[in-house]
A protein has these predicted regions:
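C-terminal transmembrane helical hairpin of 12-TM major facilitator-type secondary transporters
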Residues: 258-302
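Conserved MFS/SLC helix-loop-helix module at the cytosolic interface between two early adjacent transmembrane helices
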Residues: 35-74
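Juxtamembrane intracellular "pre-TM" segments in multi-pass secondary transporters
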Residues: 162-197
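Cytoplasmic helix-loop-helix junction between adjacent transmembrane helices
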Residues: 79-120
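A late C-terminal transmembrane helix in Major Facilitator Superfamily
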Residues: 306-342, 349-350
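Helix-breaking motifs and short loop linkers at transmembrane-helix boundaries and internal kinks
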Residues: 16, 48, 69-75, 86, ...
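Helix-loop-helix hairpin linking two adjacent transmembrane segments in secondary transporters
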Residues: 75, 104, 112-160, 164
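Paired small-residue
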Residues: 59-66, 74-82, 283-291
Length: 375
């Protein structure tokens, strides 16, 4: 998704359509990412991680080709939906595999590293996308995504299974998944601690998705940045996300990290609304966004790790719900942001998501089990 952000405005001209419809391609991709995780997560709990990952990558390559050859915006939007569906396999399985292999502090370090790597990828993606888009147009960006899918597919074929059959059988008995035909989703949703941290993760991630939806238009259309300039600035902001994610293990506890990040999100969101209202310059806007994304990284990564720790008995389903709720909510945000003045809607969504994150941190834990409860 990040890779073609710099060319969103130019895609509006290429397809001869509106900004809202081009943003709808972001929305459908996120909806696909959300829905697909609900499919690949439980399947991987039952059949292992390797085969579903291979299947997902084959689907991703095929649907990316569909995006390339789309002749109108509606074909592109539909292909983006299925591309997101396919790409969700890699997203959900990366968390599941980490949870299969690690626990406790080791899981925190590993998931923080994964988030940092994602941040580095986010740094590179818009910069590379801006360069490719400047010389080859938006379709060339999707050709590069297709090539990346082939590389990941090759890696999936060489990957060792992290959830062997004997472990799958033990997990199935422990969660009564087989004997009572209980949905693994119901099992994990009955763990209220898991639900709490999924909500914290989701609403904090909403701030990130708001920035993804609005930044190309604010930076390019309002502040006059070129696609290449936008790519560099966007990549610089992603550095904040990567560094902050990697810094998570330095906190005394995940709860401390969440409190720190949430307070920072609320304060900076208020400052951004004031800056928008007073007609701030570019560098004030950029500085506030940099700090805001750092706070989001700390909060969302800590929420992610904690939720997966509480849902490890059915890690595939837990990862699926985590991703589905997060990306499903994120898929609504571009539509909301495009419904009114982009500065007003961006500021409102920043503050709303930050406030909801803060509200979720106040959900009491004294009656909650410290371990995932099964039916």
């Amino acid at each position: 998704m990040d890779m073609y952000l710099p060319v969103l405005p130019s895609m509006t001209s290429w397809f001869m359509t509106s900004d809202a419809l081009v943003q709808l391609g972001l929305t459908t991709g996120l909806i696909g990412l959300a829905a697909g995780q609900l499919l690949f997560g439980p399947i991987s709990d039952k059949y292992g991680r390797r085969k579903p990952l291979i299947t997902a990558m084959i689907m991703f390559i095929t649907t990316t080709a569909g995006c390339i050859f789309a002749s109108n915006i509606w074909q592109f939007i539909v292909m983006r939906l299925f591309q997101g569906l396919a790409g969700s396999g890699a997203v959900v399985l990366s968390r599941s595999i980490a949870t299969d292999k690690y626990k406790g502090d080791n899981l925190t370090v590993t998931m923080s590293l994964i988030s940092a790597i994602n941040g580095v990828a986010t740094v590179a993606a818009p910069i590379v996308g801006g360069v490719i888009g400047a010389f080859g147009g938006w379709r060339t960006i999707f050709w590069s995504l297709l090539a990346l899918g082939i590389v990941i597919l090759a890696g999936a074929f060489r990957m060792h299974e992290s959830l062997p059959a004997r472990v799958r059988l033990v997990n199935a008995r422990d969660t009564e998944y087989v004997s009572h035909r209980t949905s693994p989703f119901i099992s994990v949703l009955r763990n209220r601690l898991y639900v709490k941290y999924v909500l914290i993760y989701t609403f904090s991630l909403g701030v990130l998705f708001t920035n993804l939806a609005s930044a190309p238009f604010i930076m390019q259309d309002h502040f006059g940045l070129s696609a290449m300039d936008f790519s560099i600035v966007f990549g610089f902001n992603a550095v904040a996300f990567a560094i902050a994610s990697a810094f998570l293990p330095k906190f005394k506890s995940r709860s401390q990290a969440i409190t720190f990040g949430t307070v920072g999100m609320v304060v900076v969101s208020c400052l951004i609304m004031i800056a928008f209202a007073t007609g701030c310059g570019f560098w004030i806007y950029e500085g506030l966004i940099f700090i805001l994304l750092s706070m989001v990284a700390v909060t969302s990564t800590a929420g992610n790790v904690t939720a997966m720790d509480y849902g490890r008995d059915v890690a595939g389903a837990a990862s699926a719900l985590l991703g589905a709720v997060g990306y499903g909510f994120g898929g609504l945000i571009p539509v909301i942001v495009s419904c009114g003045d982009i500065f007003v809607m961006t500021g409102v969504m920043f503050l709303l998501c930050s406030a909801m994150t803060a509200l979720c941190t106040q959900i009491p834990e004294y009656k909650m089990s410290d371990k995932p409860r099964t039916v």
